[in-house]
Structure formats: C-alpha cells, structure tokens
Amino acid sequence: MKLALRALFLLVIALGSTSLPAQHDNHDGHDHGADDGHGHGDQAGVVHEGCAHDDTYDPAEVILHHIADANEFHFVGDIHLPLPLFLYAPGHGLTTGLSSMLGDHHHLKAVDGYVMNHGRVNRMDDGAGAAMLAGEHDVECILHKTVADDKGKEVDVYYAKINGKEYKLNGASVGDGGLLGGGITNFYDFSITKNVFTMLLAALLLILLWTGVARGYKRNEGQAPSGVQALMEPFFVFIRDEISIPMIGEKYYAKFHPFIMTVFFFILFCNLFGLVPMLPGSANVTGNIAVTMALAVIAAIVAYVHGNAHFWGHVFWMPGVPVFVKPLLTVVEVLGLVIKPFSLMVRLFANITAGHIIILSLISLIFIFGGNGESVLGAGAGGVVGVAFTLFMNFIELLVAFVQPFIFAILTASYIGAAVEEHDHEHGHEGSHDVAHEDLNDGSPAYA
C-alpha cells in the first residue's frame, strides 16, 4: 500500500507539472499564443468604436470551450467557482490570488495586466506600457479579431478594451516550440486549473479510498471482506489475475502491480469526474493531450528502466537473424519504443475527447434547430432528438470510462512484461507477450 501511495503521489506531481504549461487552450481552440509575438497587434492601444457582442450560437466555439481547460469552474449563468492563480511575468514577478480578482463576465478587471478571457487568463502585451501592466483597470470588453500573421496564416487575436483603447492579449507561455499553436509569451501560468484541481481531487479520493481498504484488511484479517473493502476487492483481484500476472508474470508482477492499479484507478476516476456536468466534475482531464502524454511517458519510463539485458539485446542486436538485417531491425525496434507510448497517449486522448464532442454536438442540435430562439418548434424537435441520442451516448461514455483504463493498464503491463521477461521463462507466458508484441510494436490500436 505504501508503494501504491508513493506511485500515486509521483504520478500526480508529474501530471501536474506537465499539464500546467500545456493548458493554453482558449475558448475556441485556435492559435492564440503563437501569434502573440508578431507585430500585427497595436502595442500602445488604439481607439476602437463600440463593444458589440455577437449572440449568434456557434456550436464549434461552445464545444471547444467546454472541452478545454480553464482557470475557473463555470456552473450556469454568472455562477463561477474561482480557482487559485499563480502567474509569473519576467520583469514583474509573481502575481497570486483567486481568479475572481479578475472580475466576472459583466465586470472584468485587469490586474497587473492580467485579464480573464473566456475562462482563461491572458496578459496584455508588453507594448501596452508599464502603467497598464500594473495596478487595476476596468475592462470594458474583450474583442476578437481574425488576422493574418507574418506567414499569411489566419489566427485569432484578442484585445482588452480599456478606456476606449484596445490592448492586445497574450496567452500563457507554452513549451511546445509553436508546434501546437503555443510558444513563449510575456507570462507563465502555474495556476490550479480545472484539470489540475480534478487530478488532485482524484488522487486524494484514491488515497482515502485505498487507505480505508488497507485498514479493513488489517482489522478484519482472516475474515470475509465487508463495506468498502468488499466493494474494491473484486477490482483488485481482477486486475491482479487478468492483467498483472498474465502480462508481467508470477515472478515480477508484485513489484509492478501497485503501479498498474494506480494508473487504472487514476484514469477511471478522472473519466468518471468528466461525466459529471458540475463540480466536482466537468473537467476534461483525460481528454487533454498533455495529461495522456504524461501518463504514457511515465508508463514507458517504468517499463524501459526495468528492461533487462534480454530485452535490450532484442532491441539493439536482434538474435537469430542474419547480421546484415540486424541494423534494420534495430531501427524498427527503436521506433517501436517511441510508438508504443505514443499510441497509448493518442488512444486515450482521442476516445475521451471524441465522446465529449459527440455529446456536446447532440445537445447543440437544440439551439441549431431552434435558430437561436427564433423557432420554438425547431428547438423542441432538436430537444427530442438531442436528448434521446445524448442519453444513449452517455451510456456509451460510461462504458468507455471503464474500458479505457483497462486498455491503458493492460498495455502498460504488457510493455513492462516484455521488458522484464527472462529468456528462460519465455515458454511460461510467451503467448501473452507474443500477442502483445505483434499488436503493439507497430502502435496499432489492438484493443480499441
């Protein structure tokens, strides 16, 4: 149990540190950070007429906003739950507080240049001047423009309108080298976002749950399990007998079983929280590529660090084949080492994200058929169709919430089993590892 708790703690820390800089998604998912360094934006503020608000329903914008991370929980209307902010700007220092200090939808504030833009913290460009990047200022509204960057690519740029002037907003710095639309801007966001809060909550519940189960085993030693212990024991036995032992082997499974259990239940709890429309749910944790990447990288590190000479010998100098073929097979095997965690990452991310998008798309039928409130009959028809299909998809999502942790756990166990397998024991469980090797070496979604 202590090993499991340590593994869970390290897992949460790794996930949090990986996902914090990657939570740069804005409300519509376009490139908001990569263009921030371009010279298109008006640096010192430009007088702008009006602050018109477009009430036209945009399903794509709404869907991408709901599956993205945010610096606050939004319930309904103007009801929000603020989250802690830890913002750092080079040359200015650290700014802390709750997200509520930046105001609400009807009364936004700029604090030290930071502005809340559709649930995500942005900062005014350095060209706004020292006076605007310090103290508090009332924000009239957030303006959105689609412009062409230096390469001719259309990007979304946001401006904060203050005292009749507009100031360009930058997204938080993201260490993706611009590959995913991020880049280094004028501030870093280390805040507790919705995803981070949900991960911490899932970790806390897991610690409390399994600590209680451990106490039950000590207190009722030799007796039939009861209460929470009776509820969780089938999960423990199933994962041990159907995943850990078959994939890793009798000799080594006990060492890695706590890690497999931690991964399984962490993903499961995050998935279940994502199905809850309000607190403590609504966060799309496993639908965030940074989180699934961290999980996959951790799984790969655990497997490869414990790889024995037999495993690495097959990777770099495959036995039993002609010498001139060995270099080619080495390239293939090394690629396989990268493809395996990559397939883990994409499989979990794609399945969870697709489910959320489908459900939100079905709900959007109500507003699409209703023509933004112009057609009551259309809204009613959309409601009947949308609700019926949404209920069906929720059942599918609930199934996926359990299936995906199982897939992730069994593939992780197969990677570990292949790494620690000893040559003398190949005949004892070669079937499971051979199947895993054939299905997984090319990264194909054999279990999806």
Where are these regions (language model features)?
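Positively charged n-region of N-terminal signal peptides that target proteins for export
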Residues: M1-A7
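Perimembrane topogenic segments of multi-pass inner/organellar membrane proteins
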Residues: K2, A14, L20-P225, H437, ...
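Membrane-interfacial loop-to-helix junctions in multi-pass inner-membrane proteins
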Residues: A4, A224-G227, I248-H257
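Bacterial N-terminal signal peptides
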Residues: A7-G16
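Cytosolic juxtamembrane amphipathic/interface segments immediately preceding
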Residues: G182-F187, I239-Y253
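Juxtamembrane interface elements at the cytosolic ends of transmembrane helices
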Residues: L208-M247, G307-H314, H423-H427
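Hydrophobic alpha-helical transmembrane segments and adjacent short intramembrane/lumenal linkers
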Residues: E242, F256-M278, N284-D424
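Terminal, Lys/Arg-rich, intrinsically disordered segments and adjacent short helical elements
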Residues: E422-A448
